[in-house]
């Protein structure tokens, strides 16, 4: 491991070693907090393990769960990181609309599209993909939205402990190849496990990289 990477990892650790607090939920653009800090958004299909990953990232047991009670699932949830404030995490509503009413789907797409295109402090979006299932068409739809909005994004694999190492390697290779076709995609994939702690230090460093 290089000295430069050691510095990144330590900076990422320090970033999340202090205060992390739920700020607010925003069901529409007029409810967004003032753009006073850089933001990194977490997006992913429903049940991809987003809340668990945010909790592992921030060293909290129920931080994300506190803002995702029933009725808030179609809102953007903001978390302040650091005192004084250094950045904000944005928990985007889970997508994958097989059982969702059409008006809910349309409202979600409007909110996300408007947020991505109009939020000057958004530094990067992290797209969470379940290691067991790989990229789905709904993920590709979001990637196209990010490409069109010229928002840098990076794929983060969740639940990497749930598949064999050889299968994980194949998944990482396949997704890396696909990411090369997307102009706004960061080419390197981060494989994580909220349960085992795998990849969490690198994910913290990646968030730090995005805001400096």
Curated annotation (Swiss-Prot):
**In the record, what terms sit under GO molecular function?**
GTP binding; metal ion binding
| Cofactor(s) named in the record | Mg(2+)
Q: Keywords in alphabetical order, please.
A: Cell cycle, Cell division, GTP-binding, Magnesium, Metal-binding, Nucleotide-binding, Septation
Q: Which residues form the signal peptide?
A: none
The positions annotated for binding GTP are 44-51, 71-75, 91-94, 158-161, 192-194
Under the heading NCBIfam families, the entry gives: GTPase_YsxC
Name the UniProt record assigns to this protein: GTP-binding protein EngB
